[in-house]
Amino acid sequence: MIDKIIIKGAREHNLKDIDLEIPRDKFVVMTGLSGSGKSSLAFDTIYADGQRRYMESLSSYARMFLGQMEKPDVDSIDGLSPAISIDQKTTSKNPRSTVGTVTEIYDYLRLLYARIGIPHCPVCNREITQQTIDQIVDQICDLESGTKIQLLAPIVRGRKGKYTKELEHARKSGYVRVRIDGIIYDLSEEITLDKNKKHTIEIVVDRLVIKEGIKSRLTDSLETVFSISGGIVTIDVIDGEELTFSQNYACPEHNISIEELTPRMFSFNNPFGACPHCTGLGVFRHIDPDIIVPNKNLSIREGAIKASGWNTLDKGSVAMMYYTAIANEYGISLDTPFCELPEEVQNVFLYGTDQKLEFKIIESFGGGVRYGKFEGVINNLERRYKESNSSYSRNEIESYMSETLCPECKGNRLKKESLSVTVGGLNISQLTALSVRDCFDFFENLNLTERQQFISRQIIKEIRERLGFLKNVGLDYLNLSRSAGTLSGGESQRIRLATQIGSSLTGVLYILDEPSIGLHQRDNDKLIATMKRLRDLGNTLIVVEHDDDTMLAADYIVDIGPGAGVNGGNVVFAGTVDKLLKCKNSVTGDYLSGRKKIPVPAKRRKGNGKFLSVKGASEHNLKNINVDIPLGKLICVTGVSGSGKSSLVNEIIYKHLACKLNRAKLKAGNFKEITGCEHLDKVINIDQSPIGRTPRSNPATYTGVFTDIRELFAQTSDAKARGYSSGRFSFNTKGGRCEACEGDGIIKIEMHFLPDIYAPCEVCKGKRYNRETLEVHYKGKSIHDVLEMTVDEGVQFFEHIPKIARKLKTLQEVGLGYIKIGQPATTLSGGEAQRVKLSTELSKRATGKTIYILDEPTTGLHNADVHKLIEVLQKLADSGNTVLIIEHNLNVIKVADHIIDLGKEGGDGGGEILVCGTPEEIVKCEDSYTGRYLKPYLE
């Protein structure tokens, strides 16, 4: 078998027709500057071709249900194995997905509880034992005399299928009636069931009237039912509540029966286990009054109510018509702060009133007076949410919603019968609420009887193995019940990595995208050991990574570069780490060997002497902490994964400031008080989300330089002669754009069983504009030519137009000189998108009162890119602004003016402030993991 993956002529995106050989069954790291072509080679070429080959082996019918897979632009790839991609995308936004379900641990837990779980009475918590037929007969006979009942034998419960044989067998056995999905059918008629729907089938064994002398017949009928159903009987009480009895489990005191324990009883995604009140979600979403009225010190006239459609306060608005009617009816002033209004009146504004109010109709609606009820702002939003078919409207209203626990199951998702089954004294919900670390310890110390051990040995082995894998990738602080949608990209990737190890596949090509993201240096060694274990199983690992420790641990390194974008796309180096350290042409080698370094600042900023102070922060695992954030400094919030950094910065500080300064509709996490907001004028969160989701979004439109370029073209003599305004040069509006492709430059061609093809528009040849618009030139270049220029070329071209040159130079300063001015947003990496946002902030006039918040800005960045990023962040802080960063990268941490270190551990073991101060002060703290790893970087 070939021992290499041989790639010839790879040209995807910016790759320059490269040839490369990668050893199989090795731990291979691909590195290079952001935008150099690493992902283009690893994901868009190698993985894409592996997936495409697999999909082409399937039938056309199967391919119809799978996503499209384009053939990458490469001549050939030999030696390719089946490929599995583990990228940074969040696992699932489905509220039913949890850490337990994604890792399959929850499936094993359900099986464990079904096999060795001990049922208890949901009322008295007494351990439940089996019921005898005599006990069941006595309880049925206790029904009121004259009550009509039917004895039903369940033969199918909530399963898909047609069940023709079962129905035929019932007919031949002499039964006359059957209840299917709640409807009674005569067995003599032809019954056809939908095989794709779940059905419940119950045979009507007997029909009785409760009276003296029926015990003998009832006993015989129950024995018949139990012989058919396996110990379960459903008593259909005519005009009464249905009863279920089991020979298996029942509480003698409260007559509560529990069906035979099965895995589906413990599934919140199955109606047989899910809480019927919340259908297994554990929470309800509702309009939150605190989001509708975020600042209760404002009056109605000052805009206390922020809801969509209810915040227009002009005299002629419909909202003001309603508000005035309420004020007149209840004798209040619309200038009174909302918090000072009587509670009854506050509720009228929010929830409406059945009392008829006098509305003075505005002139535009015909004038006059009308009498009617007011449904209330919250009720109005809920009605609009249910009735609207517009995703935009629904998303807008969802921004006013928050979640509350289901009052029935208290957020546990399961029905009370399922929650009354325990193993080791804990029900399944209590067990999944433990952290992975505590759950692992629970199974280490679990005392079972000899019989229970025999039954559960293999199940517990699988559970412990999977919990161990999660511990080894640094996720021991997560709860198994944690919603998958709340995980960061790095966390979800490491969960999938742990799941893959659990599957024990061999001969597979795994492609990973920066698995170290979000991981503290302390946990990095465990992650590297996990990846090596995956390799030792007989797999090939290709890891796109910038982390020094990961590169040093690799068997083979491929360095793509030398620059980024048009300056990248070549293989600068391919070989072992030892050879890379000696390679003078590799920027990676320069930083890894220490030939180049990010310097430690000679002195730290003193700040402006003012503070943003947070008191009593208690969101998630934060333990009622107080923290002072010095303003006018570059600040890093550090700590191991799960220590509470995001809870403090993103959930509390950012959301509170966004509401206070930017009038955002967000609900901040739990805290008592935040002071010092008056020292700030705005908060800006600079993340790695795309700058736009369509090809029409690009760096020029995002930074605003495109507006200046369009205005410049409108001032040319050609444009003036034709009467063109700046709008003529927009590809988002009719007039100047090519209407064949509506300004996209490409047209989608559907190929049905083959992938859709995106072809350049035949009319404009991909230039986006019509012929007349492209005839307008500035210095010999059309608007399309300008958009095709790199930023570096643009700076030279517009050097005499300061307004344009200044904005383009800020893109240069953040290291984006290689990207095209009009490069589609969809082709920018996360790091590139973040730097476009940073450049936009740099181009604005500094007020010195802005706080910038960045969550791991080094994601996807090479050491050389990190160097440039630090210079940009320092410029923002030099202008008197505050820069607050959540970061694990020690090169960033060492240049900070102030560090807030949380810990000591993750999850329940975190949420406290270990130490605050300069990097030099942090390294003196013996309890700080950050301090230990930071020390060598300051020497």
What is the predicted function of each stretch?
Residues 1-939:
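Conserved phosphate-binding elements of NTP-dependent enzyme cores
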